[in-house]
Regions:
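Phosphate- and other anionic-substrate recognition elements at nucleic-acid/protein interfaces
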Residues: 1-195
């Protein structure tokens, strides 16, 4: 399946994800493909520990991490279904030499999200972008700092002006999820195409 967004397809919803085993940033974009307009972006963070465990698994039969991933994937599936999302974009796992064990966990989470998306529907586009690609889409490659992504998104009016709620109240996970979705739009359509 190609990853292009069809023109004149009407309203399409996209879910973008900043994956994590404890906190997972989510953003839901409403896109109008006829006018290439971002109608709205709703962003939030899922705190996995606070989710109900409906897996039916006993902790002595499954690891805590496995149960957390199941809980997270169930919520992601519900979000995809309730928004009728046609596109799901995730940040890809990355290797950090200061935290090498985190790579395996992220890989497991993103693989589980990928499987969940495809179990939800074959017509759903799924792709992922490395953190470096996300930073490059915001012209932030090589710039270090905790609030770099937050500040760079404020410089993109076609995104910043469409965020529902108070931007200053969003945490880094939900902000990163917004940036991941923006990366998809830039990679597939180019900068300044969406308004």
């Amino acid at each position: 399946m190609h990853l292009e967004i069809p023109e004149d397809y009407g309203i399409v919803n996209m879910v973008s994800i900043d994956p994590g085993s404890n906190t997972c940033g989510m953003a839901v974009y409403e896109l109008d493909t006829s006018t290439r307009t971002i109608n709205s972006i709703m962003a939030f963070t899922i705190h996995v520990e606070k989710l109900n465990d409906n897996s039916g698994l006993h902790l002595d039969l499954a690891t805590d991490r496995f149960v957390k991933i199941l809980k997270l994937c169930n919520v992601i599936k519900n979000i995809i279904e309730s928004t009728n999302a046609r596109i799901v974009v995730s940040e890809a796992p990355f290797f950090n030499k200061l935290m090498p064990m985190a790579y395996g966990s992220l890989l497991e989470i993103v693989s589980s999200i990928n499987r969940t998306v495809h179990e939800t529907g074959n017509e759903i586009i799924f792709t992922s972008y490395a953190p470096q690609q996300v930073k490059m889409s915001l012209s932030a490659a090589g710039i270090k700092g905790k609030d770099v992504i937050k500040e760079k998104l404020m410089e993109v009016p076609e995104v910043y002006s469409k965020i529902v709620g108070d931007y200053d109240l969003l945490d880094e996970h939900s902000i990163d999820a917004i940036a991941v979705g923006y990366t998809f739009l830039v990679q597939r359509c180019g900068k300044k195409v969406w308004k």
